[in-house]
Amino acid sequence: MSQPAGGRRKPRTLGPPVCSIRPFKSSEQYLEAMKEDLAEWLRDLYGLDIDAANFLQVLETGLVLCQHANVVTDAALAFLAEAPAQAQKIPMPRVGVSCNGAAQPGTFQARDNVSNFIQWCRKEMGIQEVLMFETEDLVLRKNVKNVVLCLLELGRRAWRFGVAAPTLVQLEEEIEEEVRRELALPPPDPSPPAPPRRQPCHFRNLDQMVQSLVSHCTCPVQFSMVKVSEGKYRVGDSNTLIFIRILRNHVMVRVGGGWDTLGHYLDKHDPCRCTSLSHKPGSFLKPPAPPVQHEVRVQDGPSQTQPTMTISRSQSPPPPVDWKTYTSSDRRLRPPTPSSPRPRRERGAGTGASREMAPFLRCQERSLIPSWRQPTAGDSPPSPQSSSTQKGRDPQCTSSGKREERYPPELPRGRIPTSWVHEETDSWGTDAGNPTPQRLRAIEATTKGISARGPSPLPRSFGPAECLGLRLPLRDEAKGAFFQFREPESVRSPTPVQGLTKIPIRLPPARPPTPGRSFPGATSGSPRTELGRDPIPLRAVTVDLAGSTHGDCSVEVRQEDQQLDIQVMAEARESWDLGLQEQEGRYTPLPLGGNKEQAIYCSLEEEILGNMKLLEVRSACPQGTRSGVIPRSGVYIPRLAGQWPEPGGPYDKAIQELAQGSPSLLKVDLEAWKAAPTGSPKPAVTPGPGSLKGKLGARQSGPRTKASLSAKGTHMRKVPPQGGQDCSASTVSASPEAPTPSPLDPNSDKAKACLSKGRRTLRKPKRVPSIYKLKLRPRIRPRRDHRPEKQPSRIPRPLAYVFLGPARQPPKDRLLRAVLGSKGGEASRVDGASVGEEEEEGKEEKEPAAPLESSPQPPEGLQPHWLNQAPLPPEEESWV
């Protein structure tokens, strides 16, 4: 007889509880129903005071079990005498069970009684092993389920001998009789005895209880239970028939050879409640009915087909979809509604800008996540309103009449499309045509619209080679010019209000970005960006980081480097194209030529020079004038009260230092880092004349570290030679304002001890000696007589005998150390290079990690006396 799933429960153990695969709350309900039925059965048979609560307590002594086994044996022998022919076809018990009637719960006698009953069930009744239990399953409550199933099977078999059976066994016989009538099967041989008369099941309440339990599922398509007849239902999409009966307060389901509650059965078989495929019927499946579906159509354009999104509600409802924020993966750009935020490239743009943007918007499409580009460290996650990609490669027309493929750039809000820029020049300066007034008016109108919106959030940070920029310079000779250059720059609006209008244009990157090279852009309150009507030839624009006191990197037009920069920009454009092709896996990178390499070196030198000048400005800026707001790009640029520096300031000094040559490197000796007395002069270590190489090393170490060191007040000082010593050491003092004791101070030892507390936090010893070598605690030998069978015990020497013995002369090295220590303490006050000072330094180097609170320094007058009281040698020590 197979029983419902659940398995043998493991006993409770210490540690984390073992969770079931299906932790249903109803897994113990059918056991409770069975215990109620068995308790009522035993109460009717033997008149016991037993119910489901004390069911196991009554049975744990084994007396009731052995008594019932003997009753069944007597009934079997009587049945054998009455009908020997029928008795030969079924197993019959021949021998009863011996029992100890004085057994108490938990004793060995009780265990013997239970064990005798188990052996009788196996040998005499032939109950299957899968339904049997062990002694501890009942005594220690390790497996209550098998105890119940074994008693139920015993009642089922004993009913054939005429012994009264539990109610569940009677319900089983009614169901089997109903099945035999429907299928016209012959009666079993031997025929079972007539069941006792009992009150029939009330089927009028059964259907209501079934519908109530099934209605717990809230799915649109509930787990189907179709009523076939009274107490018979067809469940799910299969042809499975189940028989349902009411047992007191429980709705029981006949499953296989056992019983289960309807609630637990639904938990295991309802797809809404159990998602495990192992518990769903795999055979006799008919075609499933079409589930309830919701069809949603999203129209992306008048000329596009309507994509259909189907939501299946067959098992569990999906999470709700917010259609206000839903965006399909191939939705195009639409004109913004008044309620939605308008893109930055569309707000405030004039008629000319709309004319220029029309062909661009036709070839641009929005998507949630660009599939061709992986986000970099500086990128922010794109949103449906801000991210846009260009799918495919639409050819764009240049001013020279050529058609070239434009690589798909990512254009966040606030950036001008690349198609506006490449129409001015072809391949970075090959087209010398002047910009037409229509194009200038379009860009002017767009720039006005972008800058007239007032303050806006900071743009996303990007690398230097990731985008290009447009610059409208401040100076008169540069007005009206339309520039392109190799580094990202900003548009300076000619207004007294401090601010920048940033119109970057993105091209594929050529080299990894330089750290700290992204410039934060800020929009002014009402800046005016004007473009002159007189076109002038293209000129190069380079970066001068030191020319800005506002922290905004201004751009200086250099006339003399015009031809070289144009060539560099053309070569950089080629390298960008090659870099993108390399990323797409089509071409291999070409080696750099001599001119190109020299041009890259020149650009790197200019960048490094500008960064070092900016660092000088940052270190010269007082800390109180810095703004507390750090831009998103992570580059913190101080603003010096909104004024330009006067000529001849720190920049000229920095240029002079760079022109003098490389500085001499100072070798730092970590062993000689010791505090110097305040009485001696302390000239500060000043760096020598710096060069580009030295400044570059300082820059690689990090400008933030330099700024933080200067802010904390940490100083590097050079210690003069003391007492004829040639070695000089540089010490790092975390608190230079703290007073340092002079060598003439009588309490110099205590002062040194106090000072060494701060010094040890800055000094890491090479090795940490053993605490027993430092003699900080008495040396205690373990007893050796704990195993007398291995070696004879030794009686420790009494302490009195040690002190009454002949006084031994201390070793010579100890006396010499005491004398040198006493003389050295006096000589150190006169001469700094005495032997005592060397001895103290040697001790400090020998014991660098000794904690001060564990080894206090003795007074100078008592130092020799303390040395004589050193720990005794091993042969003179006492045993504990």
Curated annotation (Swiss-Prot):
SMART domains in the record: CH, GAS2
Region annotation (Disordered) ranges: 180-200, 283-360, 372-437, 489-533, 676-880
Ranges annotated as biased composition (Pro residues): 185-198, 506-515
Gene3D superfamilies per record: Calponin-like domain, Gas2-like domain
Residues annotated as signal peptide: none
Record domain GAR: where: 201-273
Start-end of Basic residues biased regions: 757-767, 774-785
CDD domains registered for this protein in UniProt: CH_GAS2L1_2
Expression sites (tissue/organ): Expressed in bronchial and nasal epithelial cells (at protein level). Expressed in brain, kidney, lung, testis, fallopian tubes, and skeletal muscle. Expressed at low levels in stomach and colon.
GO biological process, one term: regulation of microtubule polymerization or depolymerization
Domain Calponin-homology (CH) residues, every copy: 32-159
Cross-referenced PANTHER family: GAS2-LIKE PROTEIN 2, TRANSGELIN
Disorder this protein is connected to according to its UniProt record: Ciliary dyskinesia, primary, 41: A form of primary ciliary dyskinesia, a disorder characterized by abnormalities of motile cilia. Respiratory infections leading to chronic inflammation and bronchiectasis are recurrent, due to defects in the respiratory cilia. CILD41 inheritance is autosomal recessive.
Protein name, entry field: GAS2-like protein 2
Lineage: Eukaryota, Metazoa, Chordata, Craniata, Vertebrata
